[in-house]
């Protein structure tokens, strides 16, 4: 009877299971996003909007200038067709298959350039995010609060690295794709206004879907290529007592200056150009997209006709076969590991 009463009166609530490690990591990624939403989302969004606004302003100026020129004369096409105003339908009828192919390359190039602004902003956002990721929490003493929670230093640092390597570039890619299609829509309106067929002249000759898929497929390349800069900046962020920007920039820059001085003095047989390219530049600029093209010898772009090879997934993923990527990636992983170790005891101001 007593045993029965004890069992009936006892606490029969089911114990709550501990959250899974992946769920905890997702929460950390979400926290990083909401704390840095201005940089991760709004900065590339505003950059894309500004690029579209400048494009619209350029179109308006071009229309005004063209109409003033039309008021003074006529447009002659191959000394055969003479029209008043700009008739893109008549222009298209005079284009050969080779001309349309070349025009398609030019369209693809314009799509890439129209979407570059969010990627440029991404480089600066990731750079300064990593630089302050572990320093700001020590400066405002919030690191003491976060360390009181059941979250390891490993998960905290890795969530910040994951935000820089995956979350921020994924958002920038999405914004860049939206900007690209908005630019294409804007140009389609201009083509329609001048009597052309945008589906034939722009959407058909160009490859907007291929360009968009290339941006999406380049995400793992960016994550691997940016590792040395992310690792170096986070290591400086957790190590520096003050002015992490100066430490992060001046150490590799002064190292490059010393190497150049040793080279001039013939003290050591050092390749100054190699050191600046593979050590200094890789440690500071790898967070800017598409710089991996230098490793695959695709940095020499000779015109719109080469846009196809530039957007080739085979050429993009060829960087995985280069030692520059893997050496930099291992160095970045080692520095992130060092940042984890340093955060365990570095909570000073």
Name what the model sees in each region.
Residues 7-27:
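Short, membrane-interfacial amphipathic segments enriched in basic
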Residues 148-152:
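Short helix-to-coil transition segments within interhelical loops
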Residues 55-59, 93, 101-123, 162-238:
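Secretory targeting signals
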Residues 21-22, 30-47, 242-248:
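Membrane-interface helix starts
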Residues 129-147, 158-161:
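Transmembrane helix boundary and interhelical loop/hinge segments in multi-pass membrane proteins
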Residues 224-226, 294-349:
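Alpha-helical transmembrane segments of multi-pass membrane transporters/translocases
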Residues 66-130, 134-137, 305-320, 327:
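Membrane-embedded or membrane-proximal helical elements that form or frame transporter/channel pores
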Residues 56-57, 211-213, 243-293:
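Transmembrane helix segments
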């Amino acid at each position: 009877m007593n045993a029965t009463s004890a069992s009936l009166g006892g606490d029969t609530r089911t114990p709550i299971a501990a959250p899974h490690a992946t769920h905890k990591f997702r929460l950390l990624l979400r926290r990083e996003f909401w704390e840095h939403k201005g940089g991760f989302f709004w900065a590339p969004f505003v950059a894309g909007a500004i690029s579209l606004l400048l494009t619209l302003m350029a179109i308006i100026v071009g229309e005004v200038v063209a109409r003033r020129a039309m008021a003074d004369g006529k447009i002659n096409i191959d000394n055969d067709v003479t029209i008043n105003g700009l008739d893109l339908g008549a222009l298209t009828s005079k284009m050969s298959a080779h001309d349309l192919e070349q025009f398609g390359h030019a369209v693809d190039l314009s799509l890439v350039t129209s979407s570059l602004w969010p990627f440029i902003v991404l480089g600066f956002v990731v750079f300064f995010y990593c630089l302050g990721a572990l320093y700001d929490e020590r400066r405002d003493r919030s690191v003491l609060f976060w360390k009181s929670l059941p979250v390891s230093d490993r998960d905290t640092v890795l969530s910040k690295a994951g935000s820089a390597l995956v979350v921020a570039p994924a958002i920038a890619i999405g914004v860049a794709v939206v900007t690209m299609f908005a630019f294409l829509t804007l140009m389609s309106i201009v083509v329609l206004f001048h009597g052309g067929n945008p589906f034939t002249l722009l959407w058909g000759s160009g490859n907007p879907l291929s360009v968009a898929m290339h941006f999406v497929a380049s995400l793992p390349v960016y994550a691997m290529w940016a590792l040395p800069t992310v690792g170096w900046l986070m290591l400086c962020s957790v190590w520096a007592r003050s002015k992490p920007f100066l430490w992060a920039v001046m150490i590799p820059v002064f190292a490059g200056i010393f190497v150049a001085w040793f080279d001039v003095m013939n003290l050591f047989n050092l390749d100054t150009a190699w050191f600046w390219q593979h050590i200094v530049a890789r440690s500071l600029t790898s967070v800017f997209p598409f710089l991996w093209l230098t490793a695959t010898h695709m940095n020499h772009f000779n015109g719109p006709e080469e846009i196809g090879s530039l957007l080739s997934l085979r050429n993009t993923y060829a960087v995985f076969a280069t030692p520059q990527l893997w050496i930099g990636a291992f160095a970045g992983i080692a520095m992130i590991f060092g940042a984890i170790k340093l955060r365990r005891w570095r909570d000073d101001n």
